[in-house]
Amino acid sequence: FEVKLNAGPTLVIEYKQESGYVPGSDVAPFSFHHIHHNYFGYRTFSSNGGEQIRVGTSTTSFTHGFNLIEYNYFEDERIEAEIISNKSWDNIYRFNTFIGNDGAMVIRHGQKCFVYGNYFDGKSGRNRSGGIRIINPNNTVFNNFLENIEGGKGNSKFPISIMDGLVDSPLNGYYPADNAIVAYNTVLNSYGPAIKLGVVNKDVKTPKVAPKNVIIIGNTIINSIGDNDSPYELTNEIGYDINFNKFKNHGIELRFLD
C-alpha cells in the first residue's frame, strides 16, 4: 500500500454494530483478524485521519477484538500523528518495523493491548517522528527497540509517551493510562526524554487527570545526541513505580536509575 493522498485510513478493521447497539455500553462481536507481512509506504494527508491502520472506532472501543498485527513494514508516512491507531481491546502489535515516519504507534482507545518486539527508526530530518503512545488503562509495552526518534525536538513526540486523561472524558476523548506497564524497551539516540509521563493534548482545554499505578521497569536508554540528559520526565501527581532502568548519556557509563 502506498501513495494514498486522500482522507481515511489505508486499512480499517470495523466492528459490526447490531440493532440497538449502545456506544460505550455494548460490545460488538469479536473479529480475530490477522494482518501480517504487508508493506505500507509513502502517504501524506493531514495531522488527523490519515492512519495506515485503524482498529475500531471510539463508538466500538469497548469491543474485545483479539486481532493480531505483526510483521508489517511502515515507511515514510508524513504529517499524520498516528501510524497505527488502536481503538478496541485485546489486540497484539508485534514484530512490526517503522522507518522514517512522522507519527507513532498509538493505543488511542481500548485496554489490555500488547505492543512488543517492534523496531522503530525515526530518522527523517523532519523532526516529527514518534514512537509509542499509550492512552487508556491496562496496556503493556515491552521489548521494543526505538532509535533516532526526532519528535522530542520541538514537536512533543517522544519514544514512549504515557498520556494524561480528561476529567469525565467522553467516549471519543482521553482516558488516563492507568496501570500501564513499560518494560525492557531500548531507546537509542532520541531527542527529549525517552519516556514521557503525563503527556497532554494541548488543543483540548478540559481539565486533565494523571494516570495511576504506572510501572516502568528494566528499560535501557542510551543517548549521544541532543542536550537533554533526562531519561524520563513526569508530572508530580502521577502514581508510578520506576525500577532497574539503565541510562547512558554522552559517554557516561551505563548506570541504573531508580
Residue positions per predicted region:
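Glycine- and acidic/polar-rich repeat regions and solenoidal domains
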Residues: 1-257
